[in-house]
Amino acid sequence: MAYSPINKGSSFQNNVRYVGTGNSPLAITGVGFEPDLTWIKKWIGSTNEAHMLSDQVRGYNYRLTTTSNAEQQAASNDLLSWQSDGFTVGSDNRVNQSSSYTYAGW
């Protein structure tokens, strides 16, 4: 039997799926812990958006994107905060577009 030093991986990494509303703020819960890194991607929708990454070292008001080789970028309405069971997003289309766009968060 394989050995893993992590008994319960979902205590450290979890995936959530949510539907955008376009309304800010939108709380995303059910993660099970306060994330240190949030990776969000529009999963279902007619427009394609880059993967958007934020971490607690840079702070929620900065992001990295996977479609650019640029440095971190200031973000004012993407990720708004982290909570004990998830995170809160603003109304930016990268993270919360209305019309039933579906997003995946890691």
Sequence positions of predicted segments:
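Surface-exposed molecular-recognition determinants
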Residues: M1-W106
